[in-house]
Swiss-Prot record:
Catalyzes 2 different reactions between oxygen and the acireductone 1,2-dihydroxy-3-keto-5-methylthiopentene (DHK-MTPene) depending upon the metal bound in the active site. Fe-containing acireductone dioxygenase (Fe-ARD) produces formate and 2-keto-4-methylthiobutyrate (KMTB), the alpha-ketoacid precursor of methionine in the methionine recycle pathway. Ni-containing acireductone dioxygenase (Ni-ARD) produces methylthiopropionate, carbon monoxide and formate, and does not lie on the methionine recycle pathway. This is Acireductone dioxygenase. Ni(2+) binds at residues 97, 99, 103, 141. Keywords: Amino-acid biosynthesis, Dioxygenase, Iron, Metal-binding, Methionine biosynthesis, Nickel, Oxidoreductase. Binds 1 Fe(2+) cation per monomer. GO terms for biological process: L-methionine salvage from methylthioadenosine; L-methionine salvage from S-adenosylmethionine. It comes from Xylella fastidiosa (strain M12).
Amino acid sequence: MSRLRIFDDHTPNTPFFVSKEQAQITAELHKIGITFERWEATQAIEPGATAEQVMAAYRADIDRLIATHGFKTVDVISIAPDNAKREEMRAKFLEEHFHKEDEVRFFVAGSGLFTVHSGNKVYEIECVKNDLIAIPDGTLHWFDMGAAPYFVAIRFFTEPDGWVGHFTGTDIAQRFPRYIPEGCQSAH
């Protein structure tokens, strides 16, 4: 289940807002310019599915976003717990950074944790299957796929180069809890 926790940026262990309600999550994220919505697949997708199978399952939604936002590149990332490069991949996204284009991800399977630093607040967004998140360009954030990552996501880009992060060099991401999927422990 999707979850949003909001913290003051100086209290990484004490959220002042927690919700698993879709409407509340969407409303809170809308306040900082983030789009959060749910999609439904026309067929089941699991890690290991081809990019073509994944995109075919969501073709209508993909085409709608391309037409609305002018995305030039769409790809699929699929990572399972046995991926030999999982630690390297996790580390790449785990530091605070921003992009010069919107970061748009749709979770086809599995889960991951996007954390957004906006003003003096930190928004921890657990994205799960069927969640679409769109983080505006220039927004400070990081992503944690967890120590045993399991997700398939469709990624949308306006730039042909794909994912390009601009890192801030701050340690804020290190001060906040690491992602442990909800089913893996009783409390986050």
